[in-house]
Design a protein with these regions (language model features):
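Long, C-terminal-biased catalytic regions of enzyme "large/alpha" subunits
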Residues: 1-89
Length: 89
């Protein structure tokens, strides 16, 4: 993926680090201290995005966020998922 479709319908370069940072901020809000967990979940999100969209697909911000929430919950990070959901509103 090279781009992401923002809420204002603009295309922006895709940057996995933004996903990792958002997960890490949510984790820290819940007392998290291990950024490697945020990176691991971010890598899982990337794998799912790659599988779904391939190299040329363009996911929306909302689609990415939905996958992040799902992966956080699947990995037992329900509190972080809740903080992430509250952050995205």
């Amino acid at each position: 993926m090279k781009f992401v479709l923002k809420r204002d319908s603009k295309l922006e370069p895709f940057d996995q680090e933004r996903i990792t940072t958002a997960i890490w901020k949510a984790a820290k809000a819940c007392g998290g201290t291990d950024k490697t967990q945020a990176k691991r979940v971010s890598d899982e999100v990337m794998a799912e995005l790659q599988k779904t969209y391939g190299d040329d697909g363009v996911p929306t911000v909302e689609e990415i966020q939905d996958i992040v929430e799902k992966r956080l919950i699947e990995n037992g990070h329900a509190q972080t998922a809740k903080a992430y959901i509250l952050y995205r509103k």
